[in-house]
């Protein structure tokens, strides 16, 4: 498979609770090889609060090397928490930070594909910006609302969904490169909002 264009994947774990399984899977050799095969050259990871040292350790475990090149911190809205690395013998740049005040800008301007935890706000951010989205459910959380929400969006044809495993994420990535999702209705949609509320509280 030839590389047609240089693409970026944005992974968001949410603002509060870290999602170590998701971060570990997207940094695995198998997943990164698949990314490169599909023409991705940049992996941007928003990993959540109080996870910086674990993230750095994980990247270094996978052979990542710190890069001194200046990151567009102003555009990313992440203060001085951002770190940049190279993986896979320099074929993949990895940018990681804990939190951003400009998530929608990152999704709109720096992402060709988004992998998100199953928080409703994060899902809607990507869909409203017309970005293809893979939803990864955090199965370590106490309730199953995330699973219900993800299932409903999948049923409606707006997203792909996967478990936080290498196999699941690779399957989601492959689907995103070969299938098309239904366009999300960006205008105010009371019936959809009611459906979402019913799903969350059912």
UniProtKB/Swiss-Prot annotation:
It catalyses: an N-acetyl-alpha-D-glucosaminyl-diphospho-di-trans,poly-cis-dolichol + UDP-N-acetyl-alpha-D-glucosamine = an N,N'-diacetylchitobiosyl-diphospho-di-trans,poly-cis-dolichol + UDP + H(+). GO terms for molecular function: identical protein binding; N-acetylglucosaminyldiphosphodolichol N-acetylglucosaminyltransferase activity. One of its GO terms (cellular component) is cytoplasm. One of its GO terms (biological process) is dolichol-linked oligosaccharide biosynthetic process. It holds the Pfam family Glyco_tran_28_C. InterPro entries: Glyco_trans_28_C, UDP-GlcNAc_transferase. Disulfide bonds: none annotated. It is found in: Endoplasmic reticulum. Its EC number is 2.4.1.141. Keywords: Endoplasmic reticulum, Glycosyltransferase, Transferase. Its main location: endoplasmic reticulum. Involved in protein N-glycosylation. Essential for the second step of the dolichol-linked oligosaccharide pathway. Belongs to the glycosyltransferase 28 family. Present with 1950 molecules/cell in log phase SD medium. Heterodimer with ALG14 to form a functional enzyme. This is UDP-N-acetylglucosamine transferase subunit ALG13. It comes from Saccharomyces cerevisiae (strain ATCC 204508 / S288c).
């Amino acid at each position: 498979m030839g590389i047609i264009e240089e693409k970026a994947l944005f992974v968001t774990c949410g603002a509060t609770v870290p999602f170590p399984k998701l971060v570990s899977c997207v940094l695995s050799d198998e997943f990164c090889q698949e990314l490169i095969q599909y023409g991705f050259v940049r992996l941007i990871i928003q990993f959540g609060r109080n996870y910086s040292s674990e993230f750095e350790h994980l990247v270094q475990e996978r052979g990542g090397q710190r890069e001194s090149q200046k990151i567009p911190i102003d555009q990313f809205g992440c203060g001085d928490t951002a770190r940049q690395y190279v993986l896979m013998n320099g074929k993949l740049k990895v940018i990681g930070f804990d939190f951003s005040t400009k998530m929608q800008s990152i999704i709109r301007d720096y992402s060709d594909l988004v992998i998100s935890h199953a928080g409703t706000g994060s899902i809607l951010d990507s869909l409203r910006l017309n970005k293809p989205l893979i939803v990864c459910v955090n199965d370590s959380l106490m309730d199953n609302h995330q699973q219900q929400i993800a299932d409903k969006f999948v049923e409606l044809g707006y997203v792909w969904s996967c478990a936080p495993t290498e196999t699941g994420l690779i399957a989601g990535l492959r689907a995103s490169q070969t299938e098309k999702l239904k366009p999300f209705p960006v205008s105010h949609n009371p019936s959809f909002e009611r459906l979402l509320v019913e799903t969350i509280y059912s």
